[in-house]
Amino acid sequence: MTLILGIDPGSRITGYGVVRQTARGCEYVASGCIRTGSGELHERLQIVFRGVSEIIAQHGPVTMGIERVFMARNADSALKLGQARGAAIVAAAEAGLEIAEYSATQVKQAVAGTGGANKEQVMMMVMHLLKLTQKPQIDASDALAIALCHAHTRSSLVPHGLATARRRGGRLRL
C-alpha cells in the first residue's frame, strides 16, 4: 500500500489529490484546493508551500506526481505557474518524497486513454476509477488524475526497476 499525492499547480488555485495504491488498484483518500487569494506573489507562493506541507503532514504520502509547466501564450502566467510548481516541489522535497513530473498529455493518456481528452472526460474517468459519487472541483480532479497517472507509471516501472527512469535533481523524468 502506497499513498500518492498528485498536485495540479497554480498561482491562485493549486489542486491536490491523495490516492492509496494497493495490489487491486487505487482508492480515493482526499482531494481539494489550496486557494491563495489575490495577495502579492510571494505571499501566494508561501500559501502553496505551507498548504502542500500540511497535506503531506496530514496524509503521509511517500511519493508525489506534479504536472509539468506547459508553454502558455502569456509568458508571465507561465512564469507564475512555474514558481507555484517550485513551491510545491520544495515542500515535497523537504518531506523526503519521491517526485515525478508528467505532461498534461501523459496524464490524459494514462487516465482517459487519449492525450487529447478534455477536462470533463478526465473528470469522468477519475470518478469512475476512484468510484466517486460526486464531482470533485476541477483542480482537485486534475490533481487526482495526476496521482492516478503516477500510480500507473510507478506500477509499470517497478517491474523494470526505477533505475530505467532518468533522475535529475532528485526528480524522476519519465
From Swiss-Prot:
| UniProt key word Cell division | no
Query: Could you tell me which Pfam families the record lists for this protein?
Result: RuvC
Provide the top EC class. Answer: hydrolase
Membrane-spanning regions, if any?
Answer: none
Q: Which reaction does it catalyse?
A: Endonucleolytic cleavage at a junction such as a reciprocal single-stranded crossover between two homologous DNA duplexes (Holliday junction)
Question: Which domain of life does the UniProt lineage start with?
Answer: Bacteria
Q: Please give the Gene Ontology molecular function terms for this protein.
A: crossover junction DNA endonuclease activity; DNA binding; magnesium ion binding
Q: Cite the InterPro entries for this sequence.
A: RNaseH-like_sf (IPR012337), RNaseH_sf (IPR036397), X-over_junc_endoDNase_Mg_BS (IPR020563), X-over_junc_endoDNase_RuvC (IPR002176)
Q: What is its EC number?
A: 3.1.21.10
- Which residues are noted in the entry as Mg(2+) 2-binding? 67
What is the protein's major site of localization?
cytoplasm
Report keywords, A-Z.
Cytoplasm, DNA damage, DNA recombination, DNA repair, DNA-binding, Endonuclease, Hydrolase, Magnesium, Metal-binding, Nuclease
SUBUNIT field: Homodimer which binds Holliday junction (HJ) DNA. The HJ becomes 2-fold symmetrical on binding to RuvC with unstacked arms; it has a different conformation from HJ DNA in complex with RuvA. In the full resolvosome a probable DNA-RuvA(4)-RuvB(12)-RuvC(2) complex forms which resolves the HJ.
Q: What does this protein do?
A: The RuvA-RuvB-RuvC complex processes Holliday junction (HJ) DNA during genetic recombination and DNA repair. Endonuclease that resolves HJ intermediates. Cleaves cruciform DNA by making single-stranded nicks across the HJ at symmetrical positions within the homologous arms, yielding a 5'-phosphate and a 3'-hydroxyl group; requires a central core of homology in the junction. The consensus cleavage sequence is 5'-(A/T)TT(C/G)-3'. Cleavage occurs on the 3'-side of the TT dinucleotide at the point of strand exchange.
Protein's name in the database: Crossover junction endodeoxyribonuclease RuvC
Question: Which species does this protein come from?
Answer: Pseudomonas putida (strain GB-1)
Q: What is the lineage of its organism?
A: Bacteria, Pseudomonadati, Pseudomonadota, Gammaproteobacteria, Pseudomonadales
Gene transcribed to yield this protein: ruvC
